[in-house]
Curated annotation (Swiss-Prot):
One of its GO terms (cellular component) is viral capsid. The keyword Membrane does not apply. It catalyses: RNA(n) + a ribonucleoside 5'-triphosphate = RNA(n+1) + diphosphate. The lineage of its organism: Viruses, Riboviria, Orthornavirae, Pisuviricota, Stelpaviricetes. This is Genome polyprotein. Pfam families: Poty_coat. Keywords: Capsid protein, Nucleotidyltransferase, RNA-directed RNA polymerase, Transferase, Virion. Its EC number is 2.7.7.48.
């Protein structure tokens, strides 16, 4: 009784859908080859011409047709009418940036008149590429290890710990939290610890530090955003300040999410947070005195002693003074 099916039924017609399609729709039952063959034979029997006749299909020629222009070309001017412009062709599209006959100019960000570096009279820049080139700051920053360096470090650590691909992400979780608390100094040694319930599980730091190229801090910079979110999550449950911020006496808990030494400062970092992070870094490096050279253990400072002493000498380091002896 629904429209338009009611009107179709009054005209002697009725919508048709095959029973095979209904079973597929409501019972999710696939149609087999026998049913398709029987359905095809039935349709051929209903229309004998369907199988024997041939049909020709003619496609429209690939000509560009202008509906407005063709109508004007075929139409004959009426008698007594004045033809204003008989040679007028296709009308120009209306520009949305125009007002009447005045065009609003568009200023380019980079123009060819700008002074540019040149070599042998030719510009060495591709301006079209430069207008579209806007990489992420962290992807080209030298404070972060490249993706290939991080992949090499990750695989080297996994091979050194002899653990599988499925277990490595859990180890990386523990390493990130440990570095938030203890920093990423290249002078760290011994073991780093992660918790398994109430049990401490130690891992050697040697493969972590030795395989970190250029530095461990640049490797851990890949964890910066996740570490920031982790600190924020901990602060939702209880007050949490990383050890890096506790040592620097950071009093504002709202800045705790920036209180770790491998935090990446970007253009989106608030000014107050950037100042606090730089002050903490300056305080951490103030007492550090890096030495280019250490004490060389292969150099001897002893010299050959050519002095000759006798029993008449005043002392082992002083000869006789004309018979005067030390009293």
């Amino acid at each position: 009784q629904q429209q338009p099916f009611a009107t179709i039924a009054q005209e002697g017609k009725a919508p048709y859908i095959a029973s095979m399609a209904l079973r597929k729709l409501y019972m999710d039952r696939a149609v087999d080859e026998e049913e398709l063959r029987a359905f095809t034979e039935m349709m051929v029997a209903l229309d004998d011409e369907f199988e024997f006749d041939s049909y020709e299909v003619h496609h429209q020629a690939n000509d560009t047709i202008d509906a407005v222009g063709d109508n004007k070309k075929d139409a004959k001017p009426e008698q007594g009418s004045i033809q204003s412009n008989p040679n007028k062709g296709k009308e120009k599209d209306v520009n949305a940036g125009t007002s009447g006959t005045h065009t609003v100019p568009r200023i380019k960000a980079i123009t060819p008149k700008m002074r540019m570096p040149k070599s042998k009279g030719a510009t060495v820049l591709n301006l079209e590429h430069l207008l579209e080139y806007a990489p992420q700051q962290i992807d080209i920053s030298n404070t972060r290890a490249t993706q290939s360096q991080f992949d090499t470090w990750y695989e080297a650590v996994r091979m050194a710990y002899d653990i599988g691909e499925t277990e490595m992400p859990t180890v990386m979780n523990g390493l990130m939290v440990w570095c938030i608390e203890n920093g990423t100094s290249p002078n760290v040694n011994g073991v780093w610890v992660m918790m398994d319930g109430n049990e401490q599980v130690g891992y050697p730091l040697k493969p972590i530090v030795e395989n970190a190229k250029p530095t461990l801090r640049q490797i851990m910079a890949h964890f910066s955003d996740v570490a920031e979110a982790y600190i924020e999550m901990r602060n939702k449950k209880e007050p949490y300040m990383p050890r890096y911020g506790l040592i620097r006496n950071l009093r504002d808990v709202g800045l705790a999410r920036y209180a770790f030494d491998f935090y990446e400062v970007t253009s989106r970092t608030p000014v107050r947070a950037r100042e606090a992070h730089i002050q903490m870094k300056a305080a951490a490096l103030k007492s550090a005195q890096p030495r280019l050279f250490g004490l060389d253990g292969g150099i001897s400072t002893q010299e050959e002693n050519t002095e000759r002493h006798t029993t008449e000498d005043v002392s082992p380091s002083m000869h006789t003074l004309l018979g005067v002896k030390n009293m």
